[in-house]
Structures are given as structure tokens and as C-alpha cells.
């Protein structure tokens, strides 16, 4: 069922201008987060226009919303309140947990208010999982893409006797941060800033912890001797027999562009997990952890991973799946500053103006209406094929018959040419036809670089910059709009 869309009413007026400005600002912010190649200094987005050509919409199905749309985020608690302006947000907000819960998990506070208990390896594993962004062993991309700031740890409470922060872990972290042979049993994590417990400017609270640290010396020394015998190095525990922890899960596609391997946070967690396994004898033939008196500590089972809170389904909730075809004149204006390396590196920068004058789009959109929220996303080509492929074959039987006839005649020709090998090499079934290709099939762009002299551009070799900008536009669209990512609008 096809529907008519009043494109002019939806994209013009104050509301249309405000939406266009928000899209421009969103794309501009995304370009500021992209690592630029050496020959590009900066990329700025100046304007965005919807154009005058409306997309073609064909409703394929009306069904119940996807389960992912019912996951409740912090911002959803005010959905029944009053006086809230319409706003949109991506599904990455759903991955953010409350700061108080993370702090309690890190410093060992439980629901009963006990913040001084015997540290075991399960507690520390939960601590390292928190740093990775998840509580079930899988990493969750944090909205903040920078490593953990050292300022959060520069306080007197973060020391080797703090619950859940174990000796050896700080030593290993110190090794990773180029600390040399500073031992975690004598130096708190704050020593990475360049100080020591006996250096100038160190808080007096840490200087007075000598009596407390003496009680734990016996048990700690036993574990350090065990590490020294295995590795021969007092400052770097062995990770030779430790399997790396799985810190990524799910697609990446969407995250093909996410550089998790270069994230310092991921490297930090890999080290801490290895240190935990070495310290507590989790290797093959290792011993169980002991307290300061030499008694074995009973290992508690970790609590089950918390499941996301789901909204309650209502009879009025519905979802529309539609085919979207667009070959319009949407406009996007960008400026990229190119660096010239002659006669010296980064000698001068030339502005390259890129104007995207239109795109060709063919995909499947999903719009779910739940309470006062509308969720919008697009399906990947694989999901669209699985959902609508059979239906397209029914609607276009002649195309499918032609493909079958061609495949049959091709198989007959192969059999005539290879009669002797027909038994050894059976015919392979024909590959299924892809109904949907790339979502953004074509992007039309005009470029202008430098000053024009006599109607001609000073430089014309701008192909690399154009390809980079267009690739980033495709990546931003696929990362932010393709399911399981989606946008939410308050209606």
C-alpha cells in the first residue's frame, strides 16, 4: 500500500528549519570525532536542506514493535510528565548507567550498606567489567569515548587497602602506564601522576596508613612471592597462560568503524583480568585465594547479570514497516581544509568546498509508536532481504522465472562441457539474489578548491578528499540509523 507524503509541509516552516539545523549540527559533531587523515586538517558542515522531492513510501506490514524498542532508559521515566519539548536521541543513551551504581560497584558498596568485606576475585572481576562498561562480561560502548581520567583516582581513598582494589593490579597498571618498577603493594594508583607516598604534596591521609597496611603484609607477601617464582619479575605478573577476556560482543558493523582495539580502556581491562587470574591462582594447578591468616576464602558465586528493564506492552502499540525509495535533491554543504606539503610539511591549507546535491536511497524503514514516543530506524540489506525477499518474488514472478530459466540453461551447458566430472563435482545450488543493496546507493557531489582563476580551479586533484568525506557520510548514516541503532522522537 503506497501513501502520499506532504513533503513540503513536513520540511518547511519553523519546525522544518529547526529539524534541518539539528541534522546539520549532528553531522558536524560526528565529523569532529572522526580521526582525519594526514592531508586533511578539519571538516566543517555549514548547511543542510531537505530539498523539494519527496520519497516514495510503500507500507509492507503493520505489526507489533520490536522488543528492543521496549528497553527503558533513564530519560524514559519522564515520558508521562508535563512540559517536555520534543527531542530525539540515539539508542546509545540506553547503554549509560547511573553514576551512583557504578561508583558503588567500583568501591565495593553493596545493597546492605556494607563497604568493608573480604575482597575476592569475583569482586575484582566485577570491578574490571565496570571499567569496560558492562556487568555481564561484555563490553558496552560508553558515551564517553576517552580513557578514564586520572583525576578520578587522585584521592586518599584509592589505595591498596581499598576494597576491590587488590595488590598486584595497581602494579600491573603502573607497568602499563610506564611506571618502571614501582610496586603496587607500596604505591597507590595515584603514583602515576609522578608522586610517591613520601613525595612532596602527598595527602597526609595516605601517610598515616602505615599501621593499617602492616596488618596485610603477611598475606600480601605470600602472593608476591608466588608471582616472583612464576614470572621472575616483581612488577609485572605473568599473562602467559591467561586467556584474553572477551571484551567485544555483537556486531560491529555498525561498528566497523569503532576502533576498540585502540581504546586504552580495553587494554587496561585486558591487563587487569590477566593480573587477577595470576594473583589468585586461577591458572591450571593454581591454589585458592587465602586471607591474611592463611585460611582459604570461600568463593562466592557472582550475582546474575542485571537484565534491562522493559516497558509494558500495550494494545495500542504498533509498528509500521515500509519500503522507502528516494532519488531527491537533498543538499549538504561541507568544507574540508587540505594541507599541502610543499615546500615543507603542512606548509599551507586550502579550503575544499563540497556540496552534496542529491542522493539515491532504497531501503526498508521501521517506525514504531509506543506511548508518546516514535522510534525510527532502517534495516540492514541482509535483514531487509530476510523480511521482504519472498514477498518481492511473489510480486515479481516473471523476474524470478527468468532467473530460474537462466540458471537451468547454464547448468545444462556446464553438464555438456563436463560430462566426465559430473559425478565428482556435483552442481552447486544457485546463490540467492540480493534484493537490497547498499542503503545509500549514490551520492552526487560537486567540489570547489582554492580560488578560481579565469573560471578554472587552481587544483583539481581532490578525489581522495571526496572519497573520504563520502565514506564518512555513509558510515555516520549506517552507525546511527541502521537497526539496532535508532532515533526516538517525543510526539
From Swiss-Prot:
Protein known as: Mitochondrial distribution and morphology protein 12
Subcellular location field: Mitochondrion outer membrane; Endoplasmic reticulum membrane
Record's compositionally biased regions (Polar residues): 230-249, 270-279
The organism of origin for this protein: Talaromyces stipitatus (strain ATCC 10500 / CBS 375.48 / QM 6759 / NRRL 1006) (Penicillium stipitatum)
Residues in SMP-LTD domain copies: 1-491
Residue ranges of the region described as Disordered: 72-123, 201-313, 389-434
Biased composition (Basic and acidic residues): 83-123, 213-229
GO MF annotation terms: lipid binding
Amino acid at each position: 500500500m503506497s501513501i502520499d507524503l506532504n513533503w513540503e509541509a513536513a520540511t518547511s516552516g519553523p519546525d522544518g528549519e529547526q529539524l534541518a539545523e539539528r541534522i546539520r549540527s549532528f553531522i558536524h559533531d560526528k565529523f569532529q570525532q572522526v580521526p582525519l587523515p594526514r592531508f586533511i586538517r578539519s571538516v566543517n558542515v555549514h548547511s543542510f536542506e531537505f530539498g523539494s522531492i519527496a520519497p516514495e513510501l510503500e507500507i509492507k506490514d503493520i505489526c507489533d514493535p520490536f522488543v528492543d524498542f521496549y528497553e527503558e532508559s533513564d530519560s524514559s521515566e519522564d515520558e508521562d510528565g508535563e512540559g517536555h519539548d520534543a527531542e530525539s536521541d540515539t539508542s546509545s543513551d540506553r547503554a549509560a548507567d547511573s553514576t551512583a551504581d557504578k561508583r558503588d560497584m567500583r568501591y565495593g558498596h553493596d545493597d546492605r550498606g556494607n563497604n568493608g568485606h573480604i575482597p575476592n576475585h569475583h569482586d575484582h572481576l566485577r570491578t574490571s567489567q565496570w571499567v569496560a562498561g558492562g556487568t555481564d562480561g561484555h563490553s558496552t560502548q560508553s558515551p564517553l569515548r576517552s580513557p578514564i581520567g586520572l583525576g578520578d583516582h587522585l584521592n586518599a581513598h584509592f589505595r591498596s587497602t581499598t576494597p576491590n582494589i587488590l595488590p598486584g593490579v595497581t602494579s600491573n597498571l603502573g607497568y602499563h602506564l610506564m611506571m618502571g618498577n614501582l610496586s603496587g603493594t607500596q604505591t597507590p594508583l595515584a603514583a602515576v601522576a609522578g608522586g610517591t607516598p613520601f613525595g612532596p604534596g602527598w595527602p597526609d591521609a595516605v601517610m598515616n596508613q602505615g599501621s593499617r597496611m602492616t596488618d596485610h603484609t603477611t598475606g600480601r607477601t605470600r602472593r608476591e612471592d608466588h608471582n616472583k617464582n612464576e614470572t621472575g619479575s616483581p612488577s609485572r605478573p605473568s599473562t602467559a597462560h591467561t586467556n584474553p577476556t572477551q571484551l567485544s560482543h555483537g556486531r560491529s558493523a555498525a561498528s566497523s568503524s569503532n576502533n576498540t582495539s585502540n581504546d586504552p580502556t580495553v587494554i587496561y581491562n585486558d591487563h587487569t583480568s590477566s593480573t587477577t587470574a595470576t594473583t589468585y591462582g586461577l591458572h591450571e594447578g593454581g591454589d585458592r585465594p587465602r586471607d591474611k591468616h592463611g585460611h582459604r576464602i570461600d568463593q562466592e558465586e557472582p550475582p546474575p547479570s542485571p537484565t534491562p528493564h522493559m516497558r509494558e506492552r500495550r494494545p495500542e502499540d504498533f509498528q509500521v514497516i515500509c519500503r522507502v525509495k528516494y532519488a531527491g535533491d537533498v543538499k549538504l554543504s561541507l568544507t574540508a581544509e587540505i594541507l599541502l606539503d610543499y615546500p615543507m610539511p603542512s606548509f599551507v591549507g586550502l579550503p575544499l568546498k563540497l556540496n552534496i546535491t542529491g542522493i539515491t536511497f532504497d531501503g526498508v524503514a521501521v517506525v514504531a509508536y509506543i506511548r508518546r514516543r516514535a522510534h525510527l530506524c532502517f534495516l540492514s540489506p541482509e535483514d531487509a532481504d530476510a523480511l521482504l525477499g519472498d514477498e518481492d518474488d511473489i510480486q515479481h514472478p516473471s523476474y524470478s522465472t527468468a532467473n530460474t530459466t537462466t540458471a537451468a540453461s547454464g547448468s545444462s551447458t556446464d553438464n555438456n562441457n563436463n560430462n566426465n566430472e559430473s559425478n565428482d563435482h556435483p552442481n552447486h545450488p544457485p546463490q540467492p539474489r540480493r534484493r537490497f543493496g547498499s542503503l545509500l546507493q549514490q551520492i552526487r557531489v560537486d567540489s570547489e578548491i582554492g580560488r578560481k582563476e579565469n573560471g578554472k580551479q587552481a587544483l583539481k586533484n581532490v578525489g581522495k578528499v571526496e572519497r573520504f568525506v563520502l565514506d564518512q557520510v555513509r558510515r555516520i548514516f549506517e552507525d546511527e540509523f541502521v537497526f539496532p541503532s535508532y532515533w526516538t522522537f517525543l510526539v
